[in-house]
Amino acid sequence: MTDSASSSSLTTLQKVLLLISAVALAVSLFLLRNGGSIESPLDQLARRSLSPEVALSNGRPTILEFYADWCEVCRDMAPAMLEMEKRHSADLDVVLVNIDNPRWLDLTDRYDVSGIPQLNLFSADGSMRGRSLGGRSATELDAIAKALVADRPLPTLSGIGSTSPLPETT
């Protein structure tokens, strides 16, 4: 009876070790797939952003996205924005401007940000070509990027997407 209990205990131990190994492998694969980063897409975009001044004066078209970390619509749109930014990174700047950072208050006022996400779209010469308010699909974001890069008319988008209202200021 003792041999049977030992054998059963060893099998349970093997199962636990196998489970731990599988979890470790899954975490390793996840980290490798994401470049070793567990940052959210919104954090990755913010980290990759140039300053607005540099982006608007470097001879490349620019998408300025006004966002906030608490904005659910911004977080939902971030994976599509990140993929679009990666596809067009050779020809287009994507700049994130966090409306909660007092540093960007002048830009928030200048571009009359009343809801987020708000995309301000600029030509290579830094002139504003248009604005989009609310969440946009991956297809819409790609169409915007292609039009800016090719200096073609911007696509017609269907109304205002979902937004997060700005908090009241006193």
What are these regions (language model features)?
Residues G115, N120-P165:
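Non-catalytic, surface beta->alpha helical segment in thiol-disulfide oxidoreductase systems
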Residues M1-D43, S164-T170:
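N-terminal targeting signals for export/organelle localization
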Residues L56-C71:
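Short active-site neighborhood of thiol/selenol oxidoreductases, capturing the structured segment around
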Residues S89-L105, G135:
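Thiol-based oxidoreductase modules, predominantly thioredoxin-like and allied folds used
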Residues W70-M77, E168-T170:
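Short, thiol/selenol-centered motifs that function as redox-active sites or metal-ligating centers
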